[in-house]
Amino acid sequence: MRTLMIEPLTKEAFAQFGDVIETDGSDHFMINNGSTMRFHKLATVETAEPEDKAIISIFRADAQDMPLTVRMLERHPLGSQAFIPLLGNPFLIVVAPVGDAPVSGLVRAFRSNGRQGVNYHRGVWHHPVLTIEKRDDFLVVDRSGSGNNCDEHYFTEEQMLILNPHQ
């Protein structure tokens, strides 16, 4: 099994998978009589159909045992999905490019610094949320509407990957 190298999360490195949601280096302007700095349009919510709605949820995630064997990835073909850490803790992101199925050799791993969120573009393969802390909370922006919006792909044993945040 191949061990994934964990890369720092940057806008450039993550661009083919979605948006990095962060204030560092982002455009902003003042509002509310100059008392508030607005970092505008950090990501775009994607939905497949006009009747789909963007919704906001909170996911409370428990840490998984590490090192982790990456056995599966999922994708959301009908909408984007954003994860914004609420407690400021670093977390891990495992992704693969859009396609009929994820290619094990193209899977990449990233580490958020805890002040960065991610917005997965429609159809991007990704692992379910991976917190490093025992328990963590994430603001999630995704799509509500008709139709199945979650496909799962399970790797064969030869395709499985190892994720070790302590490497």
UniProtKB/Swiss-Prot annotation:
Entry GO MF terms: ureidoglycolate hydrolase activity; ureidoglycolate lyase activity
Q: NCBIfam families this protein is in?
A: PRK03606.1-2, PRK13395.1
| Keyword Lyase carried by entry | yes
Q: Please write the reaction equations for the catalytic activity of this protein.
A: (S)-ureidoglycolate = urea + glyoxylate
- Which keywords describe this protein according to UniProt? Lyase, Purine metabolism
Organism of this sequence:
Pseudomonas putida (strain ATCC 47054 / DSM 6125 / CFBP 8728 / NCIMB 11950 / KT2440)
The record's top EC class is: lyase
The UniProt subunit note reads as follows: Homodimer.
Specify the signal sequence span: none
- What is this protein's record name? Ureidoglycolate lyase
Cofactor names: Ni(2+)
Is Lyase one of the keywords?
yes
Which InterPro entries does the entry link to? RmlC_Cupin_sf, UAH_cupin, Ureidogly_lyase, Ureidogly_lyase_bac, Ureidoglycolate_lyase_dom_sf
Q: Name one Pfam family in it.
A: Ureidogly_lyase
Similarity comment: family membership: Belongs to the ureidoglycolate lyase family.
What role is this protein assigned? Catalyzes the catabolism of the allantoin degradation intermediate (S)-ureidoglycolate, generating urea and glyoxylate. Involved in the utilization of allantoin as nitrogen source.
- Its Enzyme Commission number(s) read 4.3.2.3
Metabolic or biological pathway: Nitrogen metabolism; (S)-allantoin degradation
One GO biological process this protein is involved in is: purine nucleobase catabolic process
